[in-house]
Structures are given as structure tokens and as C-alpha cells.
């Protein structure tokens, strides 16, 4: 229960990291998470910082808030967060890895689901559909980040 997408961006790793680690920008990039806010006292990315993401599942609904905790934060390299209210026991983990490559950066977005019984059952029945949605959503997110990082207007739907 893991997938990833990599997109090359003609921008330095520091610029890309600045964009993906600023969760308040997520509404510009993600097809599902349309806003996010830092939970006080957090005001920016740091391990242990928490934020709330406002999600519209499958771009149709249901609409809900989820709590996220930053679990890895290396400027210019990595931004990772766990989703779920239990610190240390996330439902899933989303991660951005940024590597300098040629004229810019190769950026990989990935997710890993915690293999609970309920999630295993869900993925056995509907996982093919949700997996495709996640894969396409990661590609869309990275393409929109690329547009911003390269100085073009990010295209939103």
C-alpha cells in the first residue's frame, strides 16, 4: 500500500522544498486537499509541527478536516507528514523527496498506508480505484508545483 510519482522541475531543490513544505499553498496544487492551516504554536515546517488539511475526497466528497504531523523536514531535500490524530501512529504518510538533477530537481511524491486490517480490507475491494486516484492526484500536484517553481501560473481545475 505504497505508490510514488516523480516529476523533473527546472528549479533548484531549495525552491521546490519551499513550495511543498508550505502547507498553506496546498490548495493551489492538490486536487483533493483544498486548504491547510498550521496548528498553533506551529507557523511553518518543522518536525513535530502540526497542521489541519481540509479534504474533499475524490474531488466530490465527503469533505472533512484531518490532522497531520510533520515527521521529516530537511530543507531542500525532504518534507514528510503523517495523517491522523494519533501521534506516532498515522493512517498514512505523505512524503516529498527532492534531488538535484541536471538543470533542476527530480521531485518524488509518495504515500504509504499503515497496513491495518480495515485498510487491507478496503484496498482488497476498492484499492484499484483509490490507488489510481492517488497516483493521478500526485502527478497533478507535482505538475502544479512544477508550474509554480518554474515561474508559470499553476493550473487549477
Residue positions per predicted region:
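Hydrophobic ligand-binding cavity/cleft-lining segments
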Residues: 1-43, 47
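Hydrophobic/aromatic beta-strand elements that line small-molecule binding cavities or substrate pockets
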Residues: 5-7, 39, 65-72, 92-100, ...
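Short, cysteine-centered beta-strand-loop-beta hairpins and adjacent loop/turn segments enriched
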Residues: 57-64, 115-118
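Intrinsic-disorder/low-complexity, polar/charged segments enriched in Ser/Thr/Lys/Arg/Asp/Glu/Gln
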Residues: 1-6, 14, 50, 65, ...
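Hydrophobic pocket/interface hotspot
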Residues: 15-20, 26, 51-53, 70, ...
Amino acid at each position: 500500500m505504497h505508490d510514488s510519482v516523480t516529476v523533473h522541475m527546472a528549479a533548484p531543490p531549495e525552491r521546490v522544498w519551499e513550495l511543498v513544505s508550505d502547507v498553506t499553498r496546498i490548495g493551489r496544487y492538490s486536487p483533493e486537499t483544498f486548504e491547510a492551516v498550521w496548528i498553533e504554536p506551529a507557523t511553518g515546517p518543522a518536525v513535530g509541527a502540526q497542521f489541519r488539511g481540509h479534504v474533499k475526497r475524490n474531488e466530490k466528497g465527503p469533505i472533512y478536516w484531518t490532522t497531520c504531523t510533520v515527521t521529516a523536514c530537511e530543507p531542500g531535500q525532504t518534507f514528510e507528514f503523517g495523517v491522523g490524530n494519533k501521534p506516532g501512529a498515522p493512517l498514512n504518510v505523505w512524503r516529498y523527496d527532492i534531488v538535484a538533477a541536471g538543470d533542476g530537481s527530480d521531485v518524488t511524491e509518495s504515500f504509504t498506508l499503515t497496513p491495518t486490517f480495515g485498510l487491507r480490507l478496503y484496498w482488497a475491494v476498492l484499492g484499484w480505484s483509490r490507488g489510481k486516484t492517488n497516483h493521478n492526484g500526485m502527478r497533478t500536484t507535482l505538475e502544479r508545483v512544477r508550474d509554480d517553481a518554474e515561474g508559470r501560473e499553476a493550473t487549477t481545475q
